[in-house]
Amino acid sequence: MSLKVQNPNNVRVYTVSGEGVTQRLPNWISKRKLKKDYALSHRIELLQDFEYPEASNRIKCTRDGKYAMATGVYKPHIKVFDFAEMSLKFERHTDAENVQFEILSDDWTKSVHLQTDRTVDFHSQGGIHYSTRIPKYGRDLKYHYPNCDLYLAAAGDEVYRLNLEQGRFLNPLKIESAQIDSPTGGVNVIDINPMHQLLAFGTDAGSVEFWDPRDRSRVGILEIPSTVPSTPYSDNSRSVTALKYRNDGLNVAIGLSDGATLLYDLRSSSPYMSKDQGYSMPIKSLHWMDSALDGTARVLSADSKIIKIWEKDTGKPFSSIEPTVELNDVCPIEGTGLILTANEGSPMHAFYIPSLNPAPRWCSFLDNITEEMEENPAPTIYDDYKFVTKKELLNLGLDHLVGTGVIRAYMHGFFIDNNLYEKARLIANPFSYEEHRQKIVKERLEKQRASKIRSQNRPKVNAGLASRLSYQENKLRKKTGVTDGPSILEDERFKNVFTDKEFEVDEDTLEYKQLHPSRSEARGLTAAEESEEEKEHTKGIKFSSDEESLSDMEEENETFDALVDRRKTEQQVSNEKTPQETIRSTPSGMEMTFKVEKKKKSKPVNRDEDSTSGKKKQVTQGRRSASKNVFRNM
């Protein structure tokens, strides 16, 4: 499955429907055969039956954005497409070919059609509601919603008014600038400003008249200035063939018969931008496009050969679409990147530009499948041949083959088969294989070197700070999803922090360790903390000097015999028992060592058999026997 893609100005334009994408299938073909056909089973069909037997004339979308209405031949009929179902809703045949139509309701149920036989057909949900005729052949029509007037432009200097509320024709508007002496003179196009309802009529004489619908009077007339350059292939008469107001109420685009597009501000009589299509063909369609991706205001201008999209303020080209058939009408779906066209040829076309706007909601899958379905360039016949000049052919020693079927002359050289070229090159230059081998080895070595992990150039000053900042940046980028962006290490404002020694951070200072305790080492005790620790360790412990003073006081009150007995007892205890603990003073504080005394396990105390704590054997005396055999225990 593949899509045709164009890449003008590095902007991808996908053809999602039309010539080469949607294939017409005969009615008699079997569905079983379709399953075996890879191309047909993997084709894309954005809208079912999006085609006409011969050609399509006009196409428009409804205001609710759910339907599209198109007219075409042959036989003349109307088609309505349902976007939600992506298929044809219905088709309705008419008596004459359509010139222009207008959708009156928000959906497709009410519409008015101007036909080539001067008839005006009103269509409702059930069919043709009413049909009437105008005196001259019509060229365009517009519906004015506030007063229910239908304006019909035709040949001559009159614009007919048909009031749909009263159901009758009103006095027509007299357009003085229209050329009534010319057989083709008249009013070509009509447009109504969506903001203040100002009427604009483009004439065949190359002028635009502005009318106020409230009092039906002309406000002003705009003549095409002579300073606007014309193409050398255009005639002297330049007529207005397209008109389009912008939604802001101030800007209007005017398309001329020689392929020029002029942008005007209603407050000025001179254009602030002009653009030429380049084909000297009349402009058939103009549209204002606002991009939701970059917010740029653009203009779409189309003639029968090409569709151009360019910026409103600068005229810079954005993209262009050049279909294989002639265009009749263009309908971009508002707020999206999808463009529908009515054209000569059976299939109507649909183009999708992802960089302009996203896909419509009813075909949002286009955003995902366009790149996957993009067609791969097919190899051409020249891929198997090598182009060489006559001098290169002499160096290879193949000049004697000129004129044979092996070498084919082309422009200033020759086409030669690739295999023959390689063999001749090896014979003419035996060392070419060794050069080729060295080249391959060099490329592989460079590829391996590129794949190795290279050490990053760490700054000489504050290397630790730089590594921590880069780690935090990478962590933040993974969290936010932003892969590219300016790094703080490359910021000119903080450049001196990583290059100048004056900004170096000393991580060994006490202040830095207090601010970063997780990276600082364990510090020593202060003098106050050491004194408090000594008090805690020495609390409750009697030193040898205290014991001696107490013993001296006791010795004064004891008799000699009692003192001798007590000394003997202390000596025996000191000989039998080693000291349990030793306390000594060190520069870092008090230190105490002790030994845990091992105690012998005490033997269990023998208990009397009659005690209630336990019995060695069961006592059966005085108890009732469970068996009737009284001699069992005898």
UniProtKB/Swiss-Prot annotation:
Residues 513-522 have a biased composition (Basic and acidic residues). One of its GO terms (biological process) is maturation of SSU-rRNA from tricistronic rRNA transcript (SSU-rRNA, 5.8S rRNA, LSU-rRNA). The gene is enp2. Coiled coil: none annotated. Residues 571-588, 619-634 have a biased composition (Polar residues). WD repeats lie at residues 51-91, 182-221, 235-274, 278-320. Component of the 90S pre-ribosomes. It is found in: Nucleus, Nucleolus. It comes from the Eukaryota. May be involved in rRNA-processing and ribosome biosynthesis. Belongs to the WD repeat NOL10/ENP2 family. Keywords: Nucleus, Phosphoprotein, Repeat, Ribosome biogenesis, rRNA processing, WD repeat. This is Ribosome biogenesis protein enp2 homolog. PROSITE patterns: WD_REPEATS_REGION.
